Regions:
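S-adenosylmethionine-dependent methyltransferases
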Residues: 1-175
Length: 175
């Protein structure tokens, strides 16, 4: 798998977006959790399964799932992330649908639920993300795999969902 990515996330900082919602372009980094989840997903038999990735960023887990035969919807709030993932899917011959979705406005995801598998990598980097994700996940159905590098408040989240380790820093949640 080969992916295009921005040379520097710092160059993508938009002060007006930050002032509006404290938005920073975390999506532009190739995070170890995303790599770990993509590697794990690449070992799964996903032929014909409906897979949703939340906060996809560069979308490596989505690409891996699509290349394993899944019907994938990758979502992020950042328009630039969505556009770059479209290009990377084409570059890798992967069929990935992409959509801009806020977790606080999840109606498009709920209309398509239940999902067979929900993916997320390093989503709990802010406490407000844990709150929104905690409300959303039980409504999506299916199995959830979450890659988490060990942030302090993520531990409470993982306990809340009776997380079971399935690989290094990858957890299956009981939603």
């Amino acid at each position: 798998m080969s992916v295009l990515r921005p040379p520097s996330a710092d160059e993508l900082i938009d002060e007006s977006l930050f002032d509006e919602d404290e938005f920073l372009p975390y999506w532009a980094e190739l995070w170890p959790s995303g790599l770990a989840l993509a590697r794990h997903v690449a070992t799964l038999d996903l032929a014909g399964r409906r897979v949703l990735e939340l906060g996809c960023g560069l979308g490596l887990p989505s690409l891996a799932a699509a290349l394993r035969g899944a019907d994938v919807l990758a979502t992020d709030w950042a328009d630039d992330a969505i556009e770059l993932l479209r290009r990377n899917a084409e570059r890798n011959g992967a069929l990935v649908r992409v959509e801009r979705v806020r977790w606080s406005e999840p109606e498009p995801l709920l209309r398509a639920a239940p999902w067979d598998l929900v993916l997320g990598a390093d989503l709990l980097y802010e406490e407000r993300n844990a709150d929104q994700l905690g409300e959303l996940l039980p409504r999506l159905g299916g199995e959830t795999l979450l890659a988490e590098p060990g942030r302090p408040y993520a531990q409470d989240f993982l306990r809340r969902f009776a997380a079971e380790p399935v690989a290094d820093r990858i957890y299956r949640l009981a939603c």
